[in-house]
């Protein structure tokens, strides 16, 4: 772990709802700069800024359209550089959220990958070899591009999975992690990291860090190898840069390139607990099965809540 991380107190910022300086109703990087003294006054000396790269924002910025551009709603790259400088002058480190597992379907890499003719980005994403092929257990989309193939998704339809390879090969269209196309994906992500670190960023909180490689082994052998490779680069070129993993497995992540693990227990859908009736919506008590907190038959309906608290 980096020495500065041992004393770090992080303040997480969701940019769009933090502080708006231009009156458009959306928070921005200048708003973060304006509140640095406030943040420091709370005793915090590090920031984790949720996704702020260019995006259509179909998934809160976790669908990146351009890794090297700040989203227009938040400002400019010049604003990012100004934020790094202002924060450092106050002894505050700044980490950006990095989403290496997928891009937006509007990313230029993906647009090129969709073309039927072979090009540099044809295998930057995971494609089957036929528009009628399934995803071998992974979610997929077909029939929407000129290319004869279906593409693998990580989460939503708008988030095609970047190709880091497969740990276990089941289909002829699946590539091993040492395939040149998969190696190129790793190098492209290193290039993104260098871009922001050169500007003054202090590191990254890495989204879905444990699941880059598909069909990986139980101990994430191939994904771990990628992160050790990236850490080797950072140790040489940016020795003070921090990596924080969304992994939920510190015994694994800390041995494979990460300084800290973003460790959270995964919970259920909070909205469903409040509003939707389904088995187990409230808890395991037999009297509560199929009753959500704010539904009329729960004894804690919304009317009672409104009458007593508003």
Give the ranges of each region predicted by the language model:
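N-terminal structural segment of carbohydrate-active enzymes
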Residues: 1-190, 194-195, 202
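A generic short-segment signal for beta-strand/edge and adjacent turn/coil regions
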Residues: 16-17, 38, 63, 93, ...
């Amino acid at each position: 772990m980096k020495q500065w991380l041992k004393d770090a107190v992080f303040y997480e910022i969701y940019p769009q709802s933090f502080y708006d300086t231009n009156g458009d109703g959306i928070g921005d990087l200048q708003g973060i700069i304006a509140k640095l003294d406030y943040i420091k006054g709370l005793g915090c000396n590090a920031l984790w800024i949720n996704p702020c790269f260019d995006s259509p924002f179909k998934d809160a910025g976790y669908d990146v359209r351009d890794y090297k551009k700040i989203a227009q709603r938040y400002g400019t790259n010049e604003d990012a550089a100004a934020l790094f400088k202002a924060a450092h002058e106050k002894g505050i480190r700044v980490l950006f959220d990095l989403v290496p597992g997928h891009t937006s379907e509007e990313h230029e890499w993906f647009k090129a990958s969709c073309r039927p003719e072979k090009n540099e980005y044809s295998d930057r994403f995971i494609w089957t070899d036929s528009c009628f092929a399934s995803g071998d257990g992974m979610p997929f989309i077909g029939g929407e591009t000129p290319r004869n193939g279906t593409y693998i998704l990580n989460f939503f339809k708008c988030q095609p999975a970047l190709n880091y390879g497969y740990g276990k090969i089941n289909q002829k269209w699946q590539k091993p992690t040492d395939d040149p196309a998969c190696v190129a994906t790793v190098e492209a992500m290193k290039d993104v990291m260098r871009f922001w670190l050169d500007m003054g960023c202090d590191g990254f909180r890495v989204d879905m860090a444990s699941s880059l490689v598909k069909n990986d082994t139980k101990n994430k052998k191939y994904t771990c190898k990628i992160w050790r490779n990236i850490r080797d680069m950072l140790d040489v070129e940016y020795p003070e840069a921090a990596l924080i993993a969304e992994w939920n497995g510190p015994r694994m992540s800390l041995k494979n390139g990460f300084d800290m693990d973003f460790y959270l227990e995964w919970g259920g859908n909070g909205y469903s607990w409040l509003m939707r009736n389904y088995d187990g919506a409230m808890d395991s008590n037999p009297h509560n099965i199929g009753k959500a907190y704010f539904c009329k038959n729960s004894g804690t309906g919304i009317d009672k809540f409104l009458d007593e608290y508003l």
